[in-house]
Amino acid sequence: MDELQDVQLTEIKPLLNDKNGTRNFQDFDCQEHDIETTHGVVHVTIRGLPKGNRPVILTYHDIGLNHKSCFNAFFNFEDMQEITQHFAVCHVDAPGQQEGAPSFPTGYQYPTMDELAEMLPPVLTHLSLKSIIGIGVGAGAYILSRFALNHPELVEGLVLINVDPCAKGWIDWAASKLSGLTTNVVDIILAHHFGQEELQANLDLIQTYRMHIAQDINQDNLQLFLNSYNGRRDLEIERPILGQNDNKSKTLKCSTLLVVGDNSPAVEAVVECNSRLNPINTTLLKMADCGGLPQVVQPGKLTEAFKYFLQGMGYIPSASMTRLARSRTHSTSSSLGSGESPFSRSVTSNQSDGTQESCESPDVLDRHQTMEVSC
């Protein structure tokens, strides 16, 4: 039996530093819209034009960020242009989180996380968009997940970075309330995004985002968004039972790529989410030497993974890319017979836990297996 080979990706350069940090927050060739919904006005930024019947890539940022600070470093990355030439991009800013947003009036009731998800259908209708491939980070990943659960016909695929499918426990809630009395909101947000190792080691990145959160985001509005996220409900998703009709289980129906850095505070939450999703259409990407913002510090790896993801959905089949080191984790009940790919691959078995790992051609998607990727 062949030995499993790992191939390392060469692009591991952080995008943010003192010279180009500001540039990577900038928008290029964009159109901005303020769209009225039943739950308030939402700010949307469009890059490019929709391509025929193709879905639009729709992004949703995390707390303490907006679309610029969360995604522009990723979408301005050179290799991403191979993707954006085939897809329009729609960036959604949560209410009051966009650059230069005024404070909400006293007594304003900020939308719940469920209501934020329900603001998206009017956005698609207003822009005449038929379907999306969503990319969400943290709170944005939760919102897009809720949107996909409520409107599966509008979502073709999801890339969920640092997603937490669980409601905030009462102990966590009490701790956050207590910390809020002694800690400013900027420190709370930084602890949400970055682990202790990254907070101490990546000082330039932390300082860039500390200044952005404190100076570019309306602090009153940020507190409202943070409170909404802390009050989220459990997504109540569950892994389908083998042999059961998928329509009887509450789970994401679309192709889903879960992403988390190995030093991220969200690792446990993402692993929990993976355990609840359908292994047939879910991939878990764990990024080595990476913290809470993989789209910023490891754009090359994430871009390549996103290309594979789109290829698996039948888009951009001619995209040029290097080989990605991958390993699959199979359940013992999975069959390698009828679902076996015609492409060659090597498989190694772990007798102690009954799992198998494989390395295969990047354009192969075995729909009967759960895939776990490490890079």
From Swiss-Prot:
One of its GO terms (biological process) is cell differentiation. It holds the Pfam family Ndr. The modification Phosphoserine is found at residues 331, 334-335, 338, 341, 352, 361, 374. Residues 364-375 have a biased composition (Basic and acidic residues). InterPro entries: AB_hydrolase_fold, NDRG. Residues 330-346 have a biased composition (Low complexity). Residues 347-359 have a biased composition (Polar residues). Ubiquitous. Highly expressed in brain. GO terms for cellular component: cytoplasm; extracellular exosome. Disulfide bonds: none annotated. Gene3D superfamilies: alpha/beta hydrolase. The modification Phosphothreonine is found at residues 322, 329, 332, 355. The modification N-acetylmethionine is found at residue 1. Residues 326-375 are annotated as: Disordered. Keywords: Acetylation, Phosphoprotein. Belongs to the NDRG family. This is Protein NDRG3. The gene is NDRG3.
